[in-house]
Amino acid sequence: MSSTDDRRFEVLRAIVADYVSTQEPVGSKALVERHNLGVSSATVRNDMAFLESEGYIAQPHTSSGRVPTDKGYRQFVDRIADVKPLSTAERRAILEFLESGVDLDDVLRRGVRLLAQLTRQVAVVQYPTLSASSVRHLEVVALTPARLLLVLITDSGRVDQRIVELGDVLDDEDLARLRGLLGGALDGKRLAAASIAVSELADEAPEDLRDAVVRSATVLVETLVEHPEERLVLGGTANLTRNAADFSGISGFPGSLRAVLEALEEQVVVLKLLAATQDAGTVTVRIGEETQVEQMRGTSVISTGYGAAGTVLGGMGVLGPTRMDYPGTIASVAAVARYIGQVLAER
C-alpha cells in the first residue's frame, strides 16, 4: 500500500476516532488540531474529499463536517493492526466475576451483564445449543412415593429439573429399576438421539413399570426438545436509548431505534446472527447492511463463539450503533467469551 493510501487511512482513522468520541461530524480543522497527522490543512481537505468520493465518509445534511459510512467503518475495522488487550486487572476481575456463577444460567447472565457494562452496548448470549450437547447424567429423586424429580445434566453444564406425577406409588426397588432404565437410555447420548431412545423406552419397559416409564419419558422428551424462546439472554438494552440519536437519522444512520428494539424482541433475528458464528477463536464484525436484517441497517454486531474442550457451545456478542469503539468492543467480546469457556470447562 502506498504512502498516500496510508496517509488517507490515518485521516479516516482520525475521523472515526473523533466521531465515535464526540458524536459530532468532523471537519478538517478539528483533525489538524487534534491529531498529529504531519500534513497541512489543505492536504487533509484533499484527503477528505478523496475519502468522500470513494464512499468512506459522508456529509450529513445538517453539518459541514463529515461522518464515517459503513464502508469507512469496514475499512477501519479491516485495517486494525492491534486490538488493545484488556489489562491484567480487568481480565482477573472478569474471571473472578464469572467463576462466582453458581450454574450455567448464572454464568451466562453474569457474562451478558459484564459485557454490556464493558462495551456500553446491548450484550447477547445464546444458550448452548442442545444439538451440540450430550447427557452427562440423569438423577431420579423420589419427592414422595408418587412424585419424582428428574434432574437432567448435560455436558455443557445445562441443568433441567422436571416433576413427574406418577399414577402408582413406587417403592425403593422400583425406583432403582426406573432410574437404571432411564439412565441407560440417556447417559452419554447426544440430546437428539437421547430423545429418540427415551421415546422408544416404553415399548421395552417391564409391564409393572410401564406407566412410570411413559410418564417420565413424556416429561424428558419435552425437556430434550429445543425451545428457541429460552435460548437467548439479553443485557444492556437501556444502552440503546442512550445512543438514541444514532438511530434518529440526524447522524446519517438509516433505520430507527424502534425497529432495532423490535428486532431484538424477535429473538430469531439475533439467533441467526449468532448462529453464523462457529469459531470460538474468531471475532466477527458485521457493519450496517452486512447484518442482512432490514431493521438493523443502522447497527453493528460484533460476535464470537464460546465453548469448552474444543466444542463451540453457542454464540455471544454485542449489538449497537455503527458509531462504536470497535477496538475496545472486539477485545471485550473476545475476553468475556474466552473466560466463559474457561469457567464452563472447569465444571
Curated annotation (Swiss-Prot):
Please provide the record's keywords in A-Z order: Repressor, Stress response, Transcription, Transcription regulation
> Cross-referenced PANTHER family, in alphabetical order?
HEAT-INDUCIBLE TRANSCRIPTION REPRESSOR HRCA
Respond yes or no to whether keyword Transit peptide is given for this record.
no
Pfam families named in the record: HrcA
Q: What does the UniProt record say this protein does? A: Negative regulator of class I heat shock genes (grpE-dnaK-dnaJ and groELS operons). Prevents heat-shock induction of these operons.
Q: Which NCBIfam families match?
A: hrcA
Q: Which family does it belong to?
A: Belongs to the HrcA family.
| Stored HAMAP family | HrcA
Name by which UniProt lists this protein: Heat-inducible transcription repressor HrcA
Under InterPro entries, the record lists: GAF-like_dom_sf, HrcA, HrcA_C, WH-like_DNA-bd_sf, WH_DNA-bd_sf, WHTH_transcript_rep_HrcA_IDD
Classification lineage: Bacteria, Bacillati, Actinomycetota, Actinomycetes, Mycobacteriales
Instruction: Give the Gene Ontology MF terms in alphabetical order.
Output: DNA binding
Q: Name one GO biological process term.
A: negative regulation of DNA-templated transcription
Against Gene3D superfamilies, the record matches this protein to: 3.30.450.40, Heat-inducible transcription repressor hrca homolog, domain 3, Winged helix-like DNA-binding domain superfamily/Winged helix DNA-binding domain
